[in-house]
């Protein structure tokens, strides 16, 4: 009979306690913000706790204007610097040259390639020099995230630790915190969006749909991930070469 699995680090602790622990444990800590509700909560918690953490966000070049507006609102509200990371211009040029402006509509492979160029590679570069990063991923967001640990080895970025303080929180808990503390939130939520990414790859959802149903809605694939939060269980096959 095998040994029982070790207890999950910081499991059951409050998000604030997790963030304070991470801040004391990892001298070089980043908060990677999508500017969705969850990262807004984390930024607010960090501010209230006096946690000095570098806030990073990805500008893919295809974001809606409302996301740029949200970046400005966060800067103004918390008086912090938000480091905006952009993809490598040569990589984007090659992607567009070989596959067109909107390749993501043609196949899941090309969509994942676009996400890799515009999101995964830039994040990998931005995280160089850090020990750990905070993310707003929650287990209830999608079946692909149901096993999210509060603290885990980052398999995508060897040597880094990935910390998800809100892993056990529900959507209702997120929004209760936002309303209680008057946290600024992305304006597209008021227009029926429940998950917000790039403009051409995101739509509003209808009542009863999953939170991430508005992401890449034309795909039949159940794995609605861009690549920033792959796990061994939800990782797709390697991207096929397209002529």
Residue ranges and their predicted role:
Residues 1-243:
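Nucleotide-activated chemistry modules centered on ATP-dependent adenylation/adenylyltransferase
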């Amino acid at each position: 009979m095998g040994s029982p699995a070790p207890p999950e680090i910081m499991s059951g602790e409050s998000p604030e306690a997790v963030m304070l622990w991470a801040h004391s444990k990892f001298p070089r800590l980043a908060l990677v913000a999508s500017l969705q509700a969850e990262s807004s909560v984390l930024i607010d918690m960090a501010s209230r706790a006096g946690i000095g953490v570098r806030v990073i966000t990805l500008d893919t070049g295809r974001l809606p204007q409302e996301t740029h507006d949200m970046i400005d609102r966060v800067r103004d509200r918390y008086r912090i610097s938000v480091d905006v990371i952009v993809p490598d211009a040569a990589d984007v040029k090659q992607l567009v040259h070989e596959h067109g402006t909107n390749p993501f509509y043609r196949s899941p492979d090309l969509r994942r390639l676009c996400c890799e160029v515009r999101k995964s590679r830039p994040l990998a570069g931005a995280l160089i020099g850090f020990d750990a990063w905070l993310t707003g991923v929650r287990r209830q967001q999608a079946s692909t995230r149901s096993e999210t640990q509060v603290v885990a080895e980052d398999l995508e970025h060897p040597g880094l630790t990935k910390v998800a303080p809100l892993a056990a929180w529900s959507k209702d808990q997120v929004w209760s915190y936002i309303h209680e503390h008057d946290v600024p939130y992305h304006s597209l939520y008021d227009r029926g969006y429940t998950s917000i990414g790039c403009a051409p790859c995101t739509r509003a959802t209808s009542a009863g749909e999953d939170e991430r149903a508005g992401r890449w809605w034309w795909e039949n694939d159940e794995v609605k991930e861009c690549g920033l939060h792959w796990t061994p269980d939800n990782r797709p096959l390697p991207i096929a070469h397209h002529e």
